[in-house]
A protein has these predicted regions:
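Walker B catalytic acidic pair
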Residues: 107
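Active-site-proximal or metal-binding-adjacent scaffold patches in catalytic folds
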Residues: 1-102, 111-147
Length: 147
């Protein structure tokens, strides 16, 4: 199964409990966030991001991982390559699609390169040439992460 159900602070991508992820930001505070999605929409938006970018790594032997959702305080996602899953921050659902895709690909590339060395960045460059611009835009959404 691609998406796995987890304890209360995580959610099955197509159902389950996902907590509130972010507060409203005014234009003075940063870029406008998308409206807070309901639980099902959050799961759908983040699941679709993984599905969209997975073909970029599939040819390199990366298995389609389990995807866990979690309300995280300091990061947009992480990869547990030895256990075969990635975790995406539920707050990412309030960011534009290109930024969701960037984070999903970033985590998938960690199945190829476990650290942020030159090989990792070369793999990102080959698969998403504008990833640096997306990363820079994502920094403007940092307040979406729940304190």
């Amino acid at each position: 199964e691609v998406f796995a159900e987890q304890p209360h602070d995580r959610a099955h991508l197509f159902g389950g409990a996902i907590g509130s992820v972010a507060r409203y930001l005014s234009e003075e505070e940063g870029p406008a966030l998308l409206p807070e999605p309901d639980r099902a929409a959050c799961a759908r938006l983040l699941g679709e991001a993984v599905v969209r970018v997975y073909p970029l790594v599939a040819g390199s032997g990366v298995p389609l991982p389990q995807v866990k959702l979690r309300n995280m305080r300091s990061q947009w996602g992480n990869c547990h390559y030895q256990q075969g899953y990635i975790t995406l921050n539920t707050a990412l659902a309030r960011c534009p699609e290109p930024l969701r895709d960037y984070v999903a690909l970033h985590e998938l590339v960690h199945f190829l390169h476990h650290d942020h060395g030159s090989g990792f960045y070369a793999a990102m460059d080959a698969r998403m040439p504008d990833w640096r611009a997306r990363r820079q835009k994502l920094k403007g959404y940092a307040r979406a992460i729940v304190e």
